[in-house]
Amino acid sequence: VRRQRQMCIRDRWVFAGSGRPQGKVNEATIVKNMDPEEREYLLYLSLYDGVTSLAIGVDSLSTLDQPTVDLPVREKPVVFYGTSILQGGCASRPGMAHTNILERWLNRECINLGFSGNALLDLEIAELIATVDASMFVLDFLPNATVEQMKERAEKFYSIVRSKHPDTPILFVEDPIFT
């Protein structure tokens, strides 16, 4: 599986290109020969490989600045908790992880707390999630948590989040295996 970086251009958030890593150190031209005008970009980094350093090069007459508006809107994000599927383990490229797609569609920050093989309803994670002033919480742990873990922890996990967010929607995602 090749890990990719992906860039999208704001307006309609169209796909602009991918860089395909070939080793530990990589250099890639993702966008070139564009008309000189102001644009905003989203840059998605690899879903699994870590990044220790990142440099973005631009034409000598160009500049990089902070976005002019808060896009996506960071106030009251949607918080997702779940498995490697949620993390983006099955996505063809980083921008195609469903949380990234939803972030673009909703124009709302989506916090992706997908943990490969580790959505085990750890109560410490519930405490962490509960610190976020979210517009919605999406809990998708069924593929990882055992029946015993669900019996022991699901209600407590929910209660921790609900106690700090009595009016915020909490969506439980069902595992397709059990439908």
Give short role names for the model-derived ranges:
Residues 118-179:
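Alpha-helical cap/lid subdomain in secreted, periplasmic
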Residues 10, 16, 51-55:
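A broad structural signal for short, well-ordered beta-strand segments within beta-sheet-rich domains
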Residues 5, 38, 132-134:
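Short, well-ordered alpha-helix to beta-strand connector turns
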Residues 1, 20-23, 58-59, 116-118, ...:
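A short linear-motif detector with a strong N-terminal bias
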Residues 15-36:
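Beta-sandwich interaction modules
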Residues 34, 41-115, 123-130:
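Serine-esterase "nucleophile elbow" of acetyl-processing enzymes
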Residues 1-9:
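Single conserved hydrophobic/aromatic residue that forms the stacking wall/gate
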